[in-house]
């Protein structure tokens, strides 16, 4: 690494003011700060120095996402071979290899488009490149169906980065989760590509791996089957493990739970917000079930669809979630409850987690305001009573 450090020091003057590559200063600084600790100090304001900076936070979140990503790759291949009836004859390498080749282009498109816009925006505004998209770039491909065309994904990434992040001031200033913005853009712009029975299974072989399925092949998700009053084909064990059709990274409760442990252990995610999402979903599901308004059991609401993934990786986003400690309880409960309400009250679309997180982001500042004003009011009353 010392050789790389020496090389960067050698070419750095070219990117500084007066250098022939000064136009790409932000790009160079972005790569340098990604590889090494920046040799800069704060220019203004009071700053608390800690061992955990934004780069390390993003790195821990990416590590927490890896189990869901790897299992998602395997499940993509698993569903393809299962649909073709050749699962028993396929090896682990064939199944995972097919899934890897199917998911990799989506990861590349997400990062190329998203980081490309961030680099261009930073250079245009003469600002430092932030690390925020390192997480969004991996989450966005994990919350879409495997059949989503790459051009749709590229449009969604561009929309999310520009209109959900950069126009608000960049990383740390956005009020809406970037991945939620991309998912909602796809759902409202291309609803047929985001829902239904034809989007969850990869249908084309890749470099000789996998199987080519008929164009008319369909496979409903267990949540979709339950929403229509049917009986899901998968067992509870398969639902928890993740061997079911669904968005790439949302199917395995176990893989998501591993990520949750990492986020909670490192202190990056708030257990108050995360736990409250599950409590809100369970309470609302029990209410609807008691009223006879849904055939879906409370635990099925939790383990199916994007509920677990959204609760662990998206509702806990420290930038877009509630900041006050008491507010995190209300924020999480609100998201969990709204997710189940949308699922039950909207018969045309069985999922509701992304919309719930969007509304949660919208109301987070109001929740914090109410909590702060409540604290001020109580302190004022105590002062008067004294």
What is each residue range found by the language model?
Residues 154, 175-180, 298-306, 328-330, ...:
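Loop-to-transmembrane alpha-helix initiation sites
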Residues 1-107:
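N-terminal signal-anchor module of multipass membrane proteins
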Residues 274-325:
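A beta-strand-loop signature enriched in Asp, Gly, Thr, and Trp
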Residues 128-209:
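Membrane-interface helix-loop-helix junctions at boundaries between adjacent transmembrane segments
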Residues 172-257:
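Long hydrophobic alpha-helical segments that form multi-pass transmembrane helix bundles
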Residues 42-48, 114-125, 162-172, 258-266, ...:
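C-terminal ends of transmembrane helices
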Residues 96-110, 147-156, 239-253, 295-307:
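Structural signature of hydrophobic alpha-helical transmembrane segments
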Residues 113-118, 133-142, 157-164, 255-262, ...:
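Hydrophobic, membrane-inserted alpha-helices
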């Amino acid at each position: 690494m010392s050789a790389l450090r020496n090389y960067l020091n050698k070419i750095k003057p070219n990117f500084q003011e007066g250098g022939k590559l000064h136009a790409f200063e932000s790009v160079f600084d972005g790569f340098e700060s990604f590889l090494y600790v920046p040799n800069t100090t704060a220019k203004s304001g009071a700053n608390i120095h800690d061992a955990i900076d934004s780069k390390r936070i993003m790195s821990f979140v990416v590590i927490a996402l890896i189990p869901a990503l790897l299992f998602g790759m395997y499940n993509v291949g698993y569903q393809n071979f299962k649909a073709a009836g050749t699962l028993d004859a396929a090896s682990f390498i064939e199944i995972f290899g097919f899934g890897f080749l199917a998911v990799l282009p989506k990861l590349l498109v997400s990062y190329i488009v998203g980081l490309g816009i961030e680099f261009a925006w930073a250079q245009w505004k003469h600002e430092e490149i932030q690390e925020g998209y390192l997480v969004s770039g991996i989450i966005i491909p994990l919350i879409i169906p495997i059949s989503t065309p790459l051009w749709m994904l590229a449009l969604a990434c561009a929309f999310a980065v520009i209109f959900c992040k950069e126009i608000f001031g960049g990383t740390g200033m956005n009020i809406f989760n970037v991945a939620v913005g991309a998912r909602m853009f796809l759902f409202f712009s291309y609803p047929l590509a985001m829902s239904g029975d034809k989007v969850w299974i990869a249908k084309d072989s890749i470099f000789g791996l996998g199987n080519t399925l008929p164009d008319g092949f369909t496979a409903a998700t267990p949540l979709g089957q339950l929403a229509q009053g049917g009986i899901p084909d998968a067992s509870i064990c398969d639902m928890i493990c993740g061997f079911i059709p669904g968005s790439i990274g949302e199917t395995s409760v176990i893989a998501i739970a591993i990520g949750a442990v990492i986020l909670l252990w490192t202190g990056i995610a708030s257990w108050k917000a995360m736990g409250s999402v599950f409590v809100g979903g369970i309470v609302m599901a029990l209410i609807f079930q008691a009223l006879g308004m849904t055939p879906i059991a409370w635990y099925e609401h939790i383990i199916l669809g994007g509920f677990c993934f959204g609760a662990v990786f998206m509702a806990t986003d420290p930038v877009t979630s509630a900041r006050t400690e008491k507010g995190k309880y209300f924020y999480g409960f609100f998201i969990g409850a709204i997710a189940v309400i949308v699922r039950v009250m909207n018969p045309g679309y069985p999922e509701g987690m992304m919309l719930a997180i969007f509304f949660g982001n919208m109301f987070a500042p109001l929740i914090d305001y109410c909590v702060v004003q409540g604290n001020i009011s109580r302190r004022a009353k105590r002062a008067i009573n004294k």
